[in-house]
Amino acid sequence: MASEHTAKAFDSDLQELTRLVAEMGGLAERMIVESVDALIRRDVALGQRVVAADAEIDNLQRVIEERAVLTIARRQPMAVDLREIVGAMRVATDLERIGDLAKNMGKRVAALESDFQPLKLIRGLEHMTDLVQSQVKSVLDAYAAHDLPAAMTVWKGDEEVDAICTSLFRELLTYMMEDPRNISFCIHLMFCAKNIERIGDHATNIAETVFYMIEGQQMLDKRPKGDMTTFATTAPGN
């Protein structure tokens, strides 16, 4: 009976970790969409709400790490059970970083001054955001369902995000060269595009965590990359 009780308690601990990761993931998905929406609509209030939401993401990461460490100390899990707990901590770390990147985009809304807003660039950013948000949702679903093929689909899709980012950078550079008055807006958009691309990288990280949880080893394959840009993703102090 004691061992049965211990097993049920451990299952309950794992279920709670999964629930917390799902809650954190839902918040991260919302922050991605709202940060770009705020930027496109110049909605400072929405941008500020995204910034404020980052504190909730940070708190959820702390709770997940504390519960994970406590579960390891109490249950002393091995093999697949231990990988479940380590996986939850790794996913939480990536989601916290996604929150930071979305927060940085939310902060930039207030800095936009120009009315310059070419439709082609905006549509490109929206397309890239939709793709990355879909990848984040898909990989979190794969994590919850232990669906390795679905996780690997996200992993392979990272190259498409990189290619869109590179194309958008080229368009932005063209607009800046054509008219110096466009430079400020285009630079902010560059930061945001690079942040979205980095969010895609974190979705790829989560896919690799799913592989680790299921297969019991790290992925050795080289990531498919199509990004030809080099750009800082956050401003100093963020």
Per-segment meaning from a language model:
Residues 1-238:
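Cytosolic, long alpha-helical scaffolding segments
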